[in-house]
């Protein structure tokens, strides 16, 4: 657990992270996957089938559930805009690998915005993009709640965005 806390503290060294609010070590058993999340992507999001990090190209909830079985620990990242969780998660993933978490993999928030139009064949920005939690069937709202976070601030109605780094 000390290594995970050291990793979380590395976030403070990142540049341009004004949107970062908090991060905490969590157990992967608290991460919820559900079929309805993917269904919502398909029918309620205009980015469906437009990038390789969105459905139907991203892993589904069944595949994500299997992936989660390979991990015990994770870091959940809370931010105030949709771009920050992805950026922070990818940077943490790279640092984690150097800290002997060789299975580290990250997930961001929202759809990829690195290309004007995705070629839908082979990602040209794979080193700086990952699928979002929701694109992979993670119920972000319930996962956040399970770990003491709310998706929306009840007082001022601020919407929060989350990223995730799986560690092993």
Question: Where are the predicted features?
Answer:
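Catalytic cores of enzyme domains
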Residues: 5, 22-51, 55-168
